[in-house]
Amino acid sequence: MKIILFLVFISALAYGFVREQGISIPALSQWSRGSDSALQAALENKQSDVQVQGEGVVSRLLPDDNEGSRHQRFIIRLVTGQTLLIAHNIDLAPRVTDLDGGDTVEFYGEYEWNPKGGVIHWTHHDPNNRHVGGWLKHRGNTYQ
């Protein structure tokens, strides 16, 4: 019995460490959050204006979009292999700092379908309280 309790304790510590470091273990990530079914359905049905939550690995950093509201942009790859553009409004939310290729980013925002896979935006609070607030999580920090 002591061995089982010890193993449970060690597993919990390891899980906490993995999450804190932003390390993604695909099977563990899917198990811990479910299947991201709203995002999968939106991708498959080419839907837009869908509030979604998920996680991906940064595959490419892009230059900021400075026309109109400024957006930090990067591409993430989901565990399914699908890629998405993240467009994070840095006029309304802090820039995601120390972001590198290979980093894991969790997101909650609005999905817009496009032929390249789609865009996640509204990853920030709405100062007018007319839209659901979103966020990005990276290396233990939340950006909203």
Predicted regions and their residues:
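OB-fold and OB-like single-stranded nucleic-acid-recognition modules
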Residues: 2-144
